């Protein structure tokens, strides 16, 4: 230990670290890390400063930014030769809509919705789920689009069929680390679903409740597009923690996105924010960026309804190709700029879920990443 650090008590060392962390600002932080009581442990050993944070929501991408911004200052003020950073998560179970009881094994349900089809809702839901997992969470996804299930194909699992270990419940299909279920696993592409609304809603509720979900921090619910009776019934009856609305910058999509926000407000489901998909087209030949569907629409919509613009996802041919192959971009191109955007989105969704929610005491699990 050098002379500079010998002069510091453990309390003084912790105070220096806490003071530095308090100055770190990030879109995922409503309050600073010190106020959040995220600083779990500070220690000194062999000229190395050990810093451990515990966060109540997934935060890996933001954690990398923290290390980049704060390491030099901590080395300077402590005299350490190196810093050993560690991040752990205490993912809390948050209050569900209308205090409904939860689904066994599932802490939080995030509904991904769109007011109309064709805006990339399912592709966003899949990559969001995979990004949450990449950030350190245990994640599942339920394909709630009874009439047009696409999740099995996007995950390369369309030929798999769920099993029933007890003759009553279904075991989820595991794909790319996600626990999944979909009506698409039970019917073939040639068999169109002709169920009426109540039957479709009942089928989905059965899938949700009778799937043997493993312990999940987040279950992403890929809602059917639209704002009709089925969507309203699902929003009312599923113990959702929060909802994400997907749109494009196009005016017609924004009109329908407004309806989706209003629907969730009516049934008291917190809207976490808006994801603007296809915000800009990136040419695969020259890399030129062009906002073919317009600009600024989602941002104005978020401002009008006092919610967040959680992310803006580009339109690029590789995103579509990856889904067609059953290996979404977050899995197939982990170092790509698109995966970085999805992981930032995951951090913001998880953070917004926490800040808008209310922790249910006693339902927290610990896991280091």
Curated annotation (Swiss-Prot):
GO-annotated molecular function:
4 iron, 4 sulfur cluster binding; ATP binding; ATP hydrolysis activity; ATP-dependent FeS chaperone activity; metal ion binding
Q: Which residues bind ATP?
A: 115-122
What cellular component GO annotations does this protein have? cytosol
- Nucleotide-binding among keywords: yes
Q: Name one Pfam family in it.
A: ParA
What processes in GO biological process is this protein linked to? Answer: iron-sulfur cluster assembly
Q: Which InterPro entries match?
A: FSCA_dom_sf, Mrp-like_CS, Mrp/NBP35_ATP-bd, NUBPL-like, P-loop_NTPase, YlxH/NBP35
Keyword Zinc annotated: no
Protein keywords = ATP-binding, Hydrolase, Iron, Iron-sulfur, Metal-binding, Nucleotide-binding
Subunit annotation: Homodimer.
* Stated role: Binds and transfers iron-sulfur (Fe-S) clusters to target apoproteins. Can hydrolyze ATP.
Q: Which family does it belong to?
A: Belongs to the Mrp/NBP35 ATP-binding proteins family.
Q: What is this protein called?
A: Iron-sulfur cluster carrier protein
């Amino acid at each position: 230990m050098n002379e500079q650090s010998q002069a510091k008590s453990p309390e003084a060392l912790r105070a220096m670290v806490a003071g530095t962390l308090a100055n770190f600002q990030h879109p995922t932080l409503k309050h600073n890390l010190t106020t959040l009581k995220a600083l779990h442990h500070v220690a000194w050993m062999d000229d190395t400063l050990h810093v451990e944070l515990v966060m109540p929501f997934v935060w890996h991408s933001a954690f990398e930014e923290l290390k980049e911004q704060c390491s030099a200052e901590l080395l300077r003020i402590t005299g350490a030769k190196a810093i050993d950073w560690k991040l752990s998560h205490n993912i809390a179970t948050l209050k569900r809509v209308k205090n409904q009881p939860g689904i066994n094994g599932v802490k939080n349900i995030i509904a991904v919705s769109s007011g109309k089809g064709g805006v990339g809702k399912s592709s966003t839901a899949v990559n969001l789920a995979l990004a949450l997992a990449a950030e350190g969470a245990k994640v599942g996804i339920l394909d709630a689009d009874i009439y047009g299930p696409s999740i099995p194909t996007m995950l390369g699992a369309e030929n798999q069929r769920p099993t029933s270990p007890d003759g009553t419940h279904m075991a989820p299909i595991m794909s790319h680390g996600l626990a999944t279920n979909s009506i698409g696993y039970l019917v073939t592409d040639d068999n169109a679903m002709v169920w009426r609304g109540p039957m479709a809603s009942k089928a989905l509720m059965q899938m949700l409740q009778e799937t043997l979900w493993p312990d999940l921090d987040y279950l992403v619910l890929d809602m059917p597009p639209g704002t009709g009776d089925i969507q309203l019934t699902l929003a009312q009856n599923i113990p959702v923690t929060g909802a994400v609305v997907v749109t494009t910058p196009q005016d017609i999509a924004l009109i329908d996105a407004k309806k989706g926000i209003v629907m969730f407000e009516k049934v008291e489901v917190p809207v976490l924010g808006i994801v603007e998909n296809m915000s800009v087209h990136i040419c695969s030949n020259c890399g030129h960026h062009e906002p073919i569907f317009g600009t600024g629409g989602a941002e104005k919509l978020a401002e009008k309804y006092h919610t967040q613009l959680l992310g803006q996802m580009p339109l690029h041919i590789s995103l579509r190709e990856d889904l067609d192959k059953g290996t979404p971009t977050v899995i197939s191109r982990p170092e790509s700029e698109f995966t970085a955007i999805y992981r930032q989105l995951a951090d913001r969704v998880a953070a917004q879920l926490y800040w808008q929610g209310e922790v249910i005491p006693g339902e927290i699990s610990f896991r280091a990443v």
